[in-house]
Amino acid sequence: QQFSSQTLAKLTCLNPVQLRRVTTVLNQYQFIKTSRGKNGGYSANHSTASIKLSVLYRIFVLEKDSQQRIFTGHEQSDCEISRNIAKTMSHYNQKEHRVILNFYDTLTINDVINDTLQEDTTYDTL
């Protein structure tokens, strides 16, 4: 099934501009099919359902070029804490990403779809 960006944005309650940014990246990696023109839109392809969330996490989180400084401290400081805190927090951050990647490596787009569709009925029985 093919959806225009406007229709897809309405179905997912997302901003169409943000959605197009994501679909552009997904198309670059050939995770979806995109057709241009009056009747253009987006659709899943043969591999969409089996894409691991760890792959998407790498693309949308880890590979983003971040210029912001996320850890404080100064390596030339006389204060031991200031001198080492950035390195320590960087190690923690790397471990955090490994945990997340390991978790997401067990999930695919198909899992997200199935779990999302089950959410509507999960709380009806509680």
Question: Which role fits each region the language model picked out?
Answer:
Residues 34:
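Short beta-strand "wing" residues that participate in macromolecule-binding interfaces
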Residues 23-24:
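Short, hydrophobic-biased segments on the C-terminal half of alpha helices
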Residues 2-13:
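A short alpha-helical element within helix-turn-helix/winged-helix DNA-binding domains
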Residues 38-45:
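Minor-groove-contacting beta-hairpin "wing" of winged helix-turn-helix DNA-binding domains
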Residues 17:
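Key DNA-contact positions within bacterial/archaeal DNA-binding proteins
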Residues 70-126:
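C-terminal regulatory/oligomerization modules of transcriptional regulators
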Residues 48-73:
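Conserved segment of winged-helix/HTH DNA-binding domains
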Residues 29-30:
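Glycine-centered, phosphate/nucleic-acid-interacting loop/turn motifs that mediate DNA/RNA or nucleotide
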